[in-house]
Curated annotation (Swiss-Prot):
Superkingdom classification of source: Eukaryota
Entry keyword set: Chlorophyll biosynthesis, Chloroplast, NADP, Oxidoreductase, Photosynthesis, Plastid, Transit peptide
PANTHER family the UniProt entry points to: PROTOCHLOROPHYLLIDE REDUCTASE C, CHLOROPLASTIC
Protein task: Phototransformation of protochlorophyllide (Pchlide) to chlorophyllide (Chlide).
High-level lineage: Eukaryota, Viridiplantae, Streptophyta, Embryophyta, Tracheophyta
Species this chain originates from: Oryza sativa subsp. japonica (Rice)
First-tier enzyme category under EC: oxidoreductase
Name of this chain's protein: Protochlorophyllide reductase B, chloroplastic
């Protein structure tokens, strides 16, 4: 999808006007360019919409593309160049690592960022506060806790008529102090449902778009975590990641007919997050094995360093939030700022030297990237295949033809 609009296109979440049941599918707000495709009305009862003809939308978008000044992107390893900006889709881009990455890419002038976020207003304010220029980003509603929302997000991204050159699966939930599991709209334990299953469906659906892109270096990046990698010190802090025989995942993780944990054990919020990150890293490798040779897409994962001040830790106990940043800064030396972590992820998105597929990237203290080793479980091809097949069934892709 060639970049066609010089101005920011924003999408409002379906929750503004739709009832809870069928909200994502039926909302008139999703997938229509505001100001062109919608007339908004307010009343004492809330916000209503009227759809108008979209033919003028396409005309104006095409006219905008015609006068836009193309930007030459860096040469690929083969020496090719493309006379357009790259388009990167980033989930969880309204804060933390996602926002920092979106900013780092947008600042180059060579990337347009599609920000997949649950809260439109939060994302809009965050982009403005970060100094991102209008026209460098598009906000599209995405709730990874709903598979319907994921599918609607994919449909709305396609309506933008931009290419999909890079997909970054970044968003995550972390509930380390939870005593009881919470669940997604589809009945999955929240951490695995959002961090793994939501992203699994998103990546599978957008793979065709990545494949059809003419960008010199197409990439799918899934953010990993050192906490799910048990060959590291951090990965051995209890509770350790362990997917076991996948009996919980095979049974649906609903906490009723099956355990809410992948290994079938008792619920533990911290372990659920770590297990989801193992699934992320296994999924990246399975994507590489199945599709890299056929599509030319680079599949990679990374751990950008410990962002000890990130909002990901907002549900931790106050004492942890107080002591964790200085501990990482002065004891482990693993601390990185959100800004630096964003630059590292942006490097994996765009650096011509980081095109190797199937790699888990990390950084030394001197900010030099290197290929890191994954734990035995996180690099087990048989377990990756099993996680893939079970995940297909859970998200409704078991009979899906690629």
């Amino acid at each position: 999808m060639a970049l066609q609009a010089a101005t920011t296109t924003s999408f409002l979440p379906s929750a503004l006007s739709a009832r809870k049941e069928g909200a994502v599918k039926d909302s008139a707000f999703l997938g229509v360019r505001l100001g062109d495709g919608l007339k908004l009305e307010t009343s004492a009862l809330g916000l209503r919409t009227k759809r108008v003809s979209t033919s003028s939308v396409a005309i104006r978008a095409q006219a905008s593309a015609a006068v836009s000044s193309p930007t030459v992107t860096p040469a690929s390893p083969s020496g090719k160049q493309t006379l357009r900006k790259g388009t990167a889709v980033i989930t969880g881009a309204s804060s933390g690592l996602g926002l920092a990455t979106a900013k780092a890419l947008a600042e180059t002038g060579r990337w347009h960022v599609v920000m997949g976020c649950r809260d439109f207003l939060k994302a809009s304010r965050a982009a403005k506060a970060a100094g991102m220029e209008k026209g460098s980003y598009t906000i599209v509603h995405l709730d990874l806790a709903s598979l319907d929302s994921v599918r609607q997000f994919v449909a709305n991204v396609r309506r933008l008529e931009m290419p999909v050159d890079v997909v970054v699966c970044n968003a995550a939930v972390y509930q380390p102090t939870a005593k009881q599991p919470s669940f997604t709209a589809d009945g999955f334990e929240m951490s695995v449902g959002v961090n793994h299953l939501g992203h699994f469906l998103l990546a599978r659906e957008l793979l065709a778009d990545l494949t059809s892109s003419d960008y010199p270096s197409k990439r799918l990046i899934i953010v990993g975590s050192i906490t799910g990698n048990t060959n590291t010190l951090a990965g051995n802090v209890p509770p350790k990641a362990n997917l076991g025989d996948l009996r919980g995942l095979a049974s649906g993780l609903d906490g009723v007919s099956s355990s809410a944990m992948i290994d079938g054990g008792e619920f533990d919020g911290a372990k659920a997050y770590k297990d989801s990150k193992v699934c992320n890293m296994l999924t990246m490798q399975e994507f590489h094995r199945r599709y890299h040779g056929e599509t030319g897409v680079t599949f990679a994962s990374l751990y950008p360093g410990c962002i000890a001040t990130t909002g990901l830790f907002r549900e931790h106990v106050p004492l942890f939030r107080l002591l964790f940043p200085p501990f990482q800064k002065y004891i482990t030396k693993g601390y990185v700022s959100e800004e630096e972590a964003g630059k590292r992820l942006a490097q994996v998105v765009s650096d011509p030297s980081l095109t190797k597929s199937g790699v888990y990237w990390s950084w030394n203290n001197n900010s030099a990237s290197f290929e890191n080793q994954l734990s035995e479980e996180a690099s087990d091809p048989e377990k990756a295949k099993k996680v893939w097949e079970l995940s297909e069934k859970l998200v409704g892709l078991a009979d899906h033809d690629q």
